[in-house]
UniProtKB/Swiss-Prot annotation:
This is Guanine nucleotide-binding protein alpha-3 subunit. Residues 267-274 are annotated as: G4 motif. A lipid is attached at G2 (N-myristoyl glycine). G proteins are composed of 3 units; alpha, beta and gamma. The alpha chain contains the guanine nucleotide binding site. A lipid is attached at C4 (S-palmitoyl cysteine). Residues 198-207 are annotated as: G3 motif. GTP binds at residues 41-48, 177-183, 202-206, 271-274, 326. It comes from Ustilago hordei.
Length: 354
C-alpha cells in the first residue's frame, strides 16, 4: 500500500510525536524531582536543627527579623539551664564554693523570663549566671549531668551569657541552631537540592505527638530518622525513669517495621557525635548496655549503637547510616550531599526507572 500521508501531514504527525515525547519526559522528570522526606526521631534528637540547617544551606539563611524571633527562646533556654544547675546542686547537697554564688542561687531560681518577644535578659542576671558557671563546683556537677535533665546546649549558652545579656542582643545562626523549643504537630519545609525538589516533613518528637504521624506518610521517598548518640546515659523528659536510647530503639523498630513504609528507605542520622565523643570516656556505654564490650573506643561504641538499631529491621528496609553533628553547618552540608544521592536513587526506583 502506498503512503497516504502528504509530507506536510507527516511533518505535523512527527512534530506532534516529538511534542508528546517531550511532555512525557518532562512529566517523568517532574515526578522524579518531587521527593517527600519524613523526618522522625525522639524528642531532642536534632530533627528541628536539621530543618534549620536546610534553611541556612538551601534557603539563604535567616534575616535579622527572623533571628530576633529566637531571642526569647535563647533567653528561656539559658535561664532554664541555670535553674536546672541550681536544682541539681540542691539535689546532690552541693554548694557553690564562691560566697557570692551561694547568695545568687536563690535569685537565679526565682527569676522569671518576661514572655514579651521583645524582652531581654537583665544584665545583672547575666552576670550572676556567668559567675555561677565559673564557680569551681561546676565541673563536679557536670560530671553528674546524666542524673538530672540539662539541655545539650546549656554549656554553649553559659559560655555566651554576657553577649546574650546585652540590651541590643540579636541571636546569630549558631544561637538559633542551639535554641530548643518543643516541636508540636507537623511542619513542612520545601527547598531545592540540585535537581530534586524536597518536601521535608518534621514531626513532633515527644510521645504525646506520635499518634499523629504515620498514616499521613505512606508515599514518602525516604525517612530520615535522627538518634542522639549522646542520649545513651540520659532519661526521657516525659518520663524520668526511661532511658532515652532505649526509647529511640523502640520508636525506630516501630517505624522500620510499619506496614506504611514497606518500600521506603531509611537514612539514619547518628547525631550529636561531638557530645558522644566527650561523654564516652567519662560515662561507660557498658554501664547502660551491659553486653557492649568495646571500652571507651568511639568507633566501636558508635558501631555497637548502629548494630542495635539495624537489629530491629525485620522488614529488611535499606538503611543508610551517617554520623552527624546537626549544629555544624559544614558537617550537615557534606552529609546531605551523600543523602541527595540516596534520595535520587530511591526516587528513580519509585518511578520504575531503576
Amino acid at each position: 500500500m502506498g503512503n497516504c500521508l502528504s509530507s506536510s501531514d507527516q511533518k505535523e504527525a512527527k512534530d506532534r510525536s516529538v511534542a508528546i515525547d517531550k511532555q512525557i519526559e518532562q512529566d517523568s522528570r517532574q515526578f522524579k524531582k518531587e521527593c517527600k522526606i519524613l523526618l522522625l526521631g525522639s524528642g531532642e534528637s536534632g530533627k528541628s536543627t536539621i530543618v534549620k540547617q536546610m534553611k541556612i544551606i538551601h534557603q539563604n539563611g535567616y534575616s535579622k527579623d527572623e533571628l530576633l524571633l529566637y531571642r526569647l527562646t535563647v533567653i528561656k533556654n539559658l535561664v532554664d539551664s541555670a535553674q536546672a544547675i541550681v536544682l541539681a546542686l540542691r539535689k546532690f547537697k552541693m554548694e557553690p564554693e564562691m560566697p557570692e554564688n551561694r547568695e545568687n542561687v536563690d535569685v537565679i531560681l526565682q527569676y522569671r523570663v518576661d514572655a514579651d518577644p521583645g524582652a531581654t535578659l537583665d544584665h545583672p542576671m547575666a552576670r550572676k549566671v556567668d559567675s555561677l558557671w565559673k564557680d569551681p563546683i561546676i565541673p563536679a556537677i557536670m560530671e553528674r549531668s546524666s542524673e538530672f535533665y540539662l539541655m545539650d546546649s546549656a554549656a554553649y549558652f553559659f559560655d555566651n551569657v554576657n553577649r546574650i545579656g546585652q540590651a541590643d542582643y540579636v541571636p546569630d545562626e549558631n544561637d538559633v541552631l542551639r535554641a530548643r523549643s518543643k516541636t508540636t504537630g507537623i511542619s513542612e519545609t520545601r527547598f531545592n537540592m540540585g535537581q530534586l525538589s524536597i518536601h521535608l516533613f518534621d514531626v513532633g518528637g515527644q510521645r504525646s505527638e506520635r499518634k499523629k504521624w504515620i498514616h499521613c506518610f505512606e508515599a514518602v521517598t525516604s525517612i530520615i530518622f535522627c538518634v542522639a548518640l549522646s542520649e545513651y546515659d540520659q532519661v526521657l523528659l516525659e518520663e524520668s525513669g526511661q532511658n532515652r536510647m532505649a526509647e529511640s530503639l523502640v520508636l525506630f523498630e516501630s517505624v522500620v517495621n510499619s506496614r506504611w513504609f514497606l518500600r521506603t528507605s531509611v537514612i539514619l542520622f547518628l547525631n550529636k557525635i561531638d557530645i558522644f565523643k566527650q561523654k564516652i570516656p567519662k560515662q561507660p556505654l557498658s554501664k547502660y548496655f551491659p553486653e557492649y564490650s568495646g571500652g571507651p573506643d568511639i568507633n566501636k561504641a558508635a558501631k555497637y549503637i548502629l548494630w542495635r538499631f539495624t537489629q530491629t529491621n525485620r522488614a529488611r528496609l535499606s538503611i543508610y547510616p551517617h554520623l552527624t553533628q546537626a549544629t555544624d553547618t559544614s558537617n550537615i552540608r557534606l552529609v546531605f550531599a551523600a543523602v541527595k544521592e540516596t534520595i535520587l536513587t530511591n526516587a528513580l526506583k519509585d518511578s520504575g526507572i531503576l
